[in-house]
């Protein structure tokens, strides 16, 4: 049972990491230095984990294994706190304190808003 769960998380993490990489390739780096790709995947991942978790908790649509695959696995691999902090440090190092502050504040506030939006949409969808 434990090995099955480890494999589910690994498979989801692989898919999420590849998806994040593809978003980074698709979203051009702006001349401002603002990390739009990481910002977008973290907000989308927050929405997805809210939506998936609500469905898993309040319906029988997702098995515990599917929830593990999609939340801990995919969303965990898709989103990236460490990259966000690395990029924030880079903005600070480059003298872009305003962008760094907006990035951190926007990531936290936007992430929570997306999480709750995903949860609400799942409740309405049921």
From Swiss-Prot:
GO molecular function, one term: metal ion binding
Gene Ontology CC terms: plasma membrane
Residues that, per the record, bind Na(+): 76, 79
Compartments, record wording: Cell inner membrane
Gene Ontology annotations of biological process type: cellular detoxification of fluoride
Membrane topology type: Multi-pass membrane protein
Key word Ribonucleoprotein present: no
Regulation: Na(+) is not transported, but it plays an essential structural role and its presence is essential for fluoride channel function.
Transmembrane segments: 6-26, 32-52, 68-90, 102-122
Reaction(s) catalysed (UniProt annotation): fluoride(in) = fluoride(out)
Xref: Pfam families: CRCB (PF02537)
Keywords: Cell inner membrane, Cell membrane, Ion channel, Ion transport, Membrane, Metal-binding, Sodium, Transmembrane, Transmembrane helix, Transport
NCBIfam families with a match to the protein in the record: crcB
Name the record gives this protein: Fluoride-specific ion channel FluC
Species in which this protein is naturally found: Chlorobaculum tepidum (strain ATCC 49652 / DSM 12025 / NBRC 103806 / TLS) (Chlorobium tepidum)
Classification lineage: Bacteria, Pseudomonadati, Chlorobiota, Chlorobiia, Chlorobiales
Gene this protein is translated from: fluC
